[in-house]
Each structure stands twice: as C-alpha cells, then as structure tokens.
C-alpha cells in the first residue's frame, strides 16, 4: 500500500514537473539563492569555534575586530538571497498554478455534456480554485523548505563531522527513526488532504446552490434548511482541517523528542574523559549548536510534508480529471455552409443511468428551408431531439443526417457552426449586450451587423432606452435584464450567426404576448431561407409550420400540418382544445 502511494506521488510529481521546468531559469536562480542562504546560516555557526578558541583567548586577536563586518556581510547576503529566492519561487509558483488552471479549464470545455450532467458545479469550481491553489504549496512553499532546510541540514552535518566525528556519529542512530516518522506523517497528510479536497467541493456546491436559488430560498422560507445544510458541510470541513492540524502538531514534538535524544547522548559523551580531552570549548559549542540547529530545519521539513502532500493530492485529482476522455470528435467531414436538409432515421436514445429510453425509433425529415415543429407534454423527448442534432449526445441507434451525411461524420466544431440555437434557458455572459450578441459570430461581424440583429429581434426597443445602449453590462447571466429581454438578446445572437439550421427550443416562452408577436414576425422573415426545428409549448407559434410532430413518451404519435391534425381530432387537437379553452 505504501509502495503504491510513493509511486503514485512520484508519478504525479513527474507530471507536475513538466509545468515547473517551463520556468527552470527562475527556479535555478531561486535554488542558488536558497543554497547561499543556508550556507550563510551554517557559516555563522562555524564562527563560534574561532570566536571561543581564539577570539576571547587573545586580547590582540584580529578576529574580534573583523567579526562585526563579517557578521554584517553574512546578514546582508542572507537578506538578499532570501528576497531573491522568495520572489523567484513565487513567480514560478504563480505561473505553474496559472498553467494548471488553464489546463483544467480547457479540458472542461472539451468534456461532453453528459459529464456535466453527473458532476456538481461546486466541485468543478473547487478544482479550478482550491485544488489549483494547493498545487502552489508543492511548487513554492514546499520547494523553499526542501532546498533551504535540506541544504542547512547537509551543511550542519558536514560542520559537525568536521569538528568531531565521534559525537556526530550519534545522529546515524537517530536518522532512521526520524525518516520513519516523516514517512508515516506524509501518508497521513496525503489521506487527510484528499478528504479535504472532497469536502471543499461539497462546501462550494452548497454555497453555490443557495446563491443561485436565493429567490426560491426567500420565497419558501428555506433559510433555516439551507443554514442547517451549510452548517453540516462546514463542520465536516472543520473536522478535516483539525485532523490535519492535529497530525501536524503531533509530528513536530515527536521529531523534536527523537532529536533531543541525540542531544542528550552528545552531552553525556562530551563528559567522557577520552572524548572530553579531545574537545575544545569552541569545538563542543559548534557541534552542540549545529546539532541543536538541526531542530529547526527538521521541524520545517515536517511542516512542509503537509504542504507537499496537499499539493500532490490536489495535483493527482487534477491530472485524473484531464485524463478523462474528452468529447468524441472522430468526424472529418467539413463544409463551409450546409444546405440545411435534415433526415432523422429511426433514432433511439437513453440517458446514462436511466432505465427507460428518452427516444424510441423516431424518424422524420426536414427539407431545406422548411419548418418542423415538435409538440407534446413536458418530458416527452422534444428537447432531447434538439440535443442530438448538435451532438451534445450521440444516438444509441439510427442516425441523424445533415445534407445526407451522418452528423457523427462531421468535424464537431464545423457541425455546430451549421446550427443556431435559442432555448428557453437563456445564458448570458457578464459582458456588454453587444458582446453577448456577437458571441455567436466569432470575429465575423461589424457593429452594424449587431445593431441589425438586435433590431430584427426587437431588442433595440429596450436597448435604446439604456444609457449605454449596446455597451450596457448585463450582469451575471443577464441579471440586470428581464426574462423577456434576455430572450430577445439570445434571439439576436442566433440571428447574427445566420446558420442554415435554426433550433428554437421554447424560444418565445419567456415573452409576453406583445413581444411574442414582434419576435414571431422577425422569425418568420428569418425562416424563409433556413431549415427550422421548433420545440413549442404555445401552439399559436407553430400553426404555420410545414409539419408538426406530436411526441409522447419518446415516440412520434402524430404528424401533419396544423389543419390536418385538427381535422384528425387526435392528440394534437386535444392539446389545442386544452390550450385555447375550446369545448
């Protein structure tokens, strides 16, 4: 178990090193500065021998006169090296964390929709924020301690053995015990760190859930429920933190106690006549001071074990994430602009983990420039069909063709440029209205194009009344706009894209009747040269569709034009009567 853990840590560090070595120049400068810092400390201890053996023994000693300048010089060098090492390692660490965050963020954007269906958004955010920051502990604080304290230990050991190898041999007996203690503590830190990462994700998810649903919380008086829920996860985080602190607090005195045994033995041996005769006051003081000085770096290395293991545990979690298979993009077919003919051939689809298929043997065609509407009760599978068009999910059987080519054979990015999507769940970015509209068009637009799209979507009616017009910031997810205004901005975004296939998933559901009429006139104009799939709740918006499909329980139960389906007096006619209060 321990061997596997050590191997895992080593593999993780090697992967992390691929990021660190990008900044090896800064790292090299920092390491040199740390070594100079440690050597300065060791040399300061070595000055005790000539000071005691020669300096105080001779009134004419030049050593005493030069000592103040020597000490000042050492402290100056130590100060400069400390600043350089701290700055350079912070620079390296900051860049490494930035690269790791970019890696995770970029991989998120390549993951399939099904991955986000399963993961809590709070946990995903925690990996970019908390876990990435923990990597900094392994690339800055930990490295500082490992290099500086490691060099100090080596320097002090050399100094001790040089002055009295007999007394220094005691450390050989103590060293294995110290090494075992540090190894034991490392494994404990690693386990606790992993638990802390998981708990931090839960804390973030709980807070995010409340913040996003604060209106629901206030409306239904759920403050106590949310408070109780957050208290539980916060306490779990506190418990994990206390476990880490307890392990760290216990490790320091244990290692110091082990080291103190060596000091006690040295004091005893120094009193033995055969050894005492070989010692001068300076020699004994140097050896004893060096041995006592080992306590600080040993304690620091114990503390850094906690930091290093937290960083390794976080890095392991992040690397496990980026090792997940991204969204499949095996298609190679590409076209600048599709004609827009869509054929759905006997498709079936089941969501991961679901027992019942969302769609079962669905077939229909949308000729170029025609409009097909999907209607049916909630959960019947209408939006699932739209998601399959753009390959947010892949069909289990059957195929969807665009211009006679299976959508799975298209290069994924190229396929999605052929579609413009407006759903009932509008997402706007914390940016200006203009940039939100232009988001769909990349850099292929002008200011006039944005204004024209906003005009067609009847968005300029409210935009023109704003002080900054199109340059108005909309807030997080369009918080400063009403539901209808957000919907019109989203429609303007789709209009600007000018894709050959338009998907309207309850696109007018958030609009009042007057706004809906205005939007519908713009959409009627837009649909003249485009293939359109409309998913609608309001049947009044799809009466002009070339074909209407009634979806129920994942299957097509009726199809035809509005008049044909009314005349048939089946499921569609029943929906129509319910919605319009007829009969």
UniProtKB/Swiss-Prot annotation:
<comment type="function">
    <text>Involved in lipopolysaccharide (LPS) biosynthesis. Translocates lipid A-core from the inner to the outer leaflet of the inner membrane. Transmembrane domains (TMD) form a pore in the inner membrane and the ATP-binding domain (NBD) is responsible for energy generation.</text>
</comment>
<dbReference type="Pfam" id="PF00664">
    <property type="entry name" value="ABC_membrane"/>
</dbReference>
<feature type="transmembrane region" description="Helical">
    <location>
        <begin position="165"/>
        <end position="185"/>
    </location>
</feature>
<keyword id="KW-1133">Transmembrane helix</keyword>
<keyword id="KW-1003">Cell membrane</keyword>
<dbReference type="GO" id="GO:0015421">
    <property type="term" value="F:ABC-type oligopeptide transporter activity"/>
</dbReference>
<keyword id="KW-0067">ATP-binding</keyword>
<dbReference type="InterPro" id="IPR017871">
    <property type="entry name" value="ABC_transporter-like_CS"/>
</dbReference>
<keyword id="KW-0547">Nucleotide-binding</keyword>
<comment type="subunit">
    <text>Homodimer.</text>
</comment>
<keyword id="KW-0445">Lipid transport</keyword>
<dbReference type="GO" id="GO:0005886">
    <property type="term" value="C:plasma membrane"/>
</dbReference>
<dbReference type="GO" id="GO:0034040">
    <property type="term" value="F:ATPase-coupled lipid transmembrane transporter activity"/>
</dbReference>
<dbReference type="InterPro" id="IPR036640">
    <property type="entry name" value="ABC1_TM_sf"/>
</dbReference>
<keyword id="KW-1278">Translocase</keyword>
<feature type="transmembrane region" description="Helical">
    <location>
        <begin position="249"/>
        <end position="269"/>
    </location>
</feature>
<comment type="similarity">
    <text>Belongs to the ABC transporter superfamily. Lipid exporter (TC 3.A.1.106) family.</text>
</comment>
<keyword id="KW-0812">Transmembrane</keyword>
<dbReference type="InterPro" id="IPR011527">
    <property type="entry name" value="ABC1_TM_dom"/>
</dbReference>
<feature type="transmembrane region" description="Helical">
    <location>
        <begin position="142"/>
        <end position="162"/>
    </location>
</feature>
<dbReference type="Pfam" id="PF00005">
    <property type="entry name" value="ABC_tran"/>
</dbReference>
<dbReference type="GO" id="GO:0005524">
    <property type="term" value="F:ATP binding"/>
</dbReference>
<keyword id="KW-0997">Cell inner membrane</keyword>
<dbReference type="InterPro" id="IPR011917">
    <property type="entry name" value="ABC_transpr_lipidA"/>
</dbReference>
<feature type="domain" description="ABC transporter">
    <location>
        <begin position="342"/>
        <end position="578"/>
    </location>
</feature>
<keyword id="KW-0472">Membrane</keyword>
<feature type="domain" description="ABC transmembrane type-1">
    <location>
        <begin position="28"/>
        <end position="310"/>
    </location>
</feature>
<keyword id="KW-0813">Transport</keyword>
<feature type="transmembrane region" description="Helical">
    <location>
        <begin position="27"/>
        <end position="47"/>
    </location>
</feature>
<dbReference type="GO" id="GO:0016887">
    <property type="term" value="F:ATP hydrolysis activity"/>
</dbReference>
<dbReference type="InterPro" id="IPR039421">
    <property type="entry name" value="Type_1_exporter"/>
</dbReference>
<dbReference type="InterPro" id="IPR003593">
    <property type="entry name" value="AAA+_ATPase"/>
</dbReference>
<dbReference type="InterPro" id="IPR003439">
    <property type="entry name" value="ABC_transporter-like_ATP-bd"/>
</dbReference>
<feature type="binding site">
    <location>
        <begin position="376"/>
        <end position="383"/>
    </location>
    <ligand>
        <name>ATP</name>
    </ligand>
</feature>
<protein>
    <recommendedName>
        <fullName>ATP-dependent lipid A-core flippase</fullName>
        <ecNumber>7.5.2.6</ecNumber>
    </recommendedName>
</protein>
<dbReference type="InterPro" id="IPR027417">
    <property type="entry name" value="P-loop_NTPase"/>
</dbReference>
<feature type="transmembrane region" description="Helical">
    <location>
        <begin position="69"/>
        <end position="89"/>
    </location>
</feature>
């Amino acid at each position: 178990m321990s061997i596997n853990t050590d191997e895992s840590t080593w593999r993780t560090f090697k992967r992390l090193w691929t990021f660190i070595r990008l900044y090896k120049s800064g790292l090299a400068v920092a390491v040199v500065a740390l070594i100079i810092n440690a050597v300065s400390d060791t040399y300061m201890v070595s000055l005790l021998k000539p000071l005691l053996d020669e300096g105080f023994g001779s009134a004419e000693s030049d050593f005493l006169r030069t000592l103040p300048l020597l000490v000042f010089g050492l402290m100056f060098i130590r100060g400069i090296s400390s600043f350089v090492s701290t700055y350079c390692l912070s620079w390296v660490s900051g860049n490494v964390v930035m690269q790791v965050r970019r890696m995770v963020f970029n991989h998120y954007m390549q993951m399939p929709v099904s991955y986000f269906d399963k993961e809590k958004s709070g946990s995903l955010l925690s990996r970019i924020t908390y876990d990435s920051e923990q990597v900094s502990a392994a690339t800055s604080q930990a490295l500082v301690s490992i290099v500086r304290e490691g060099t100090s230990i080596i320097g002090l050991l050399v100094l001790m053995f040089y002055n009295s190898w007999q007394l220094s041999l005691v450390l050989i007996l103590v060293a294995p015990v110290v090494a075992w203690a540090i190894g034991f503590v490392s494994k404990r830190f690693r386990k606790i760190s992993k638990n802390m990462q998981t708990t931090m994700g839960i804390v973030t998810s709980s807070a995010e859930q409340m913040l996003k649903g604060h209106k629901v919380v206030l409306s239904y008086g759920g403050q106590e429920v949310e408070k109780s829920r957050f208290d539980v996860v916060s306490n779990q985080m506190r418990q994990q933190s206390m476990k880490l602190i307890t392990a760290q607090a216990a490790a320091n005195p244990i290692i110091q106690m082990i080291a103190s045994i060596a000091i006690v033995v040295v004091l005893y041996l120094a009193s033995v006549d055969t050894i005492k005769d070989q010692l001068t006051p300076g020699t004994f003081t140097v050896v004893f001071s060096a041995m006592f000085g080992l306590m600080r770096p040993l304690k620091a290395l114990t503390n850094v074990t906690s930091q290093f293991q937290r960083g390794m545990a976080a890095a392991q979690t992040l690397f496990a994430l980026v090792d997940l298979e991204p969204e499949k993009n095996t298609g190679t077919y590409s076209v600048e602009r599709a004609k827009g003919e869509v054929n759905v051939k006997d498709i079936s689809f089941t969501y991961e983990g679901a027992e019942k298929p969302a769609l079962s043997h669905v077939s229909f065609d949308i000729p170029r420039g025609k409009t097909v509407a999907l209607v049916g009760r909630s959960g019947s599978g209408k939006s699932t069909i739209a998601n399959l068009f753009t390959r947010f999910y892949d069909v289990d059987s059957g195929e969807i063709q665009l211009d006679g080519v299976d959508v799975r054979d298209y290069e994924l990015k190229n396929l999605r440029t052929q579609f413009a999507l407006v759903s009932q769940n509008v997402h706007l970015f914390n940016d200006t209205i203009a940039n939100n509209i232009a988001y769909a068009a990349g850099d292929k637009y002008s200011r006039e194009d944005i204004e024209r799209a906003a005009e067609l979507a009847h968005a300029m009616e409210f935009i023109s009344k704003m002080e900054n017009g199109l340059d108005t910031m909309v807030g997080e997810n369009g918080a400063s706009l009403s539901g209808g205004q957000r919907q019109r901005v989203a429609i303007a975004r789709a209009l600007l894209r000018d894709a050959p296939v338009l998907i309207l998933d309850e696109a007018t559901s958030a609009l009042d009747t007057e706004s809906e009429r205005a939007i519908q006139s713009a959409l009627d104009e837009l649909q003249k040269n485009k293939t359109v799939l409309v998913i609608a709740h309001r049947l009044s918006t799809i009466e002009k569709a070339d074909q209407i499909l009634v979806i129920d329980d994942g299957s097509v139960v009726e199809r035809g034009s509005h008049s044909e389906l009314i005349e048939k007096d089946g499921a569609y006619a029943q929906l129509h009567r319910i919605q319009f209060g007829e009969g």
